[in-house]
Regions:
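Non-heme Fe(II)/2-oxoglutarate
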Residues: 1-105, 123-126, 242
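Residues at beta-strand starts and edge strands
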Residues: 12-16, 111, 134-136, 209-211
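Solvent-exposed residues in well-ordered beta-strands and their adjoining turns
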Residues: 23, 120, 141-143, 216-220
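Aromatic-acidic/polar surface patches that form glycan- and anion
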Residues: 67, 71, 131, 184, ...
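Solvent-exposed amphipathic alpha-helical surface segments
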Residues: 85-92, 145, 220, 224
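A short beta-turn/loop motif at secondary-structure boundaries
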Residues: 105-109, 205-207
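Catalytic core of non-heme Fe(II) oxygenases with the double-stranded beta-helix
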Residues: 109-192
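Catalytic core of Fe(II)/2-oxoglutarate
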Residues: 171-264
Length: 264
């Protein structure tokens, strides 16, 4: 990665965390969307699939991501993040050698695998963990408690309710910032990182809600994407429109019965 004249960083092993401020209007839309999800009695709980010792964690449906404009934004930011990773040292060439469907000249595509919202309250926490079945993860901070109780040892401030990246090691605090503090300065920021980077969220004491939105993304080659699109096209051609019953009601059924046995 060119950092200046005669200064190039070659660190393909580095776990890059990239932070970007979410556009104000999109942030407002996201806050409203997560409000509605939290209040919906039919919300889809994500708790069974997540590591958090947290009661309120809910999936965000793909159509909601698309309608809100989040899908387009997440794909744009993830693609930009992956481009940054590839320019770091020889990652581009290394991926091309190792994987059959590598970047191949930056010819790749991004897809959002899943997204969920986390509503964390007093004494709840997220233990150290990483994310599987994806390559890139991200978290957007939406809300922090207005005031949390001070720690028992008051000189150790800034950790309660904080997002901690553990994979960076105990580096000099002047060189790295592995702690995303639980305060208003971090609201509205999106942080992207490798899915393998271990992280946790500390508990806090006091009233109020700590809210975030997370998503997992995968990176595939354009060749893979074209293959998926072609496969979906072929599946669509197998679908028959069958006129059943009175009143001309139309039901769509798959010609291949095995499609009905597929996992969701």
């Amino acid at each position: 990665m060119e950092m200046g004249d005669n200064w190039q960083v070659n660190a393909p092993w580095a776990q890059l965390v990239v932070s970007t401020k979410v556009p104000d209007e999109l942030f407002k839309t996201t806050l409203e969307l997560t409000d509605k999800i939290y209040e919906d009695v039919n919300r889809d709980s994500a708790g069974g699939s997540l590591a958090g010792q947290i009661h309120n964690e809910y999936y965000i449906a793909q159509e909601k991501l698309i309608e809100s404009g989040l899908m387009e934004y997440f794909i744009e930011m993830t693609t930009k993040y992956w481009g940054t990773v590839l320019t770091n040292g020889n990652m581009w060439q290394a991926c091309d050698r190792k994987f059959e469907h590598g970047p191949h000249g930056f010819n790749y595509a991004c897809k959002i695998v899943s997204a969920w919202t986390v509503h964390q309250f007093e004494n709840e926490y997220n233990p150290i963990h990483d994310h599987s079945n994806c390559k890139i993860s991200a978290v957007m901070h939406l809300k922090f408690p207005e005031k949390i109780d001070p720690p028992v040892k008051e000189h150790l401030t800034g950790l309660d309710g904080a997002l901690i990246f553990s994979g960076m090691g105990d580096a000099d605090e002047w060189c790295t910032a592995p702690v995303m503090k639980c305060d208003s300065s971090n609201v509205g920021w999106l942080h992207l990182f490798p899915s393998s980077l271990q992280h946790s969220v500390y508990p806090f004491r006091g009233k109020g809600e700590r809210r975030s939105l997370s998503f997992n993304a995968d990176i595939i080659s354009q060749k893979q994407l074209d293959s998926i699109v072609e496969q979906q096209k072929n599946e669509q051609e197998k679908i028959k429109i069958v006129n059943k019953g009175k009143g001309g009601k139309m039901n769509i059924i798959a010609a291949d019965e095995e499609n009905e046995k597929g996992e969701m």
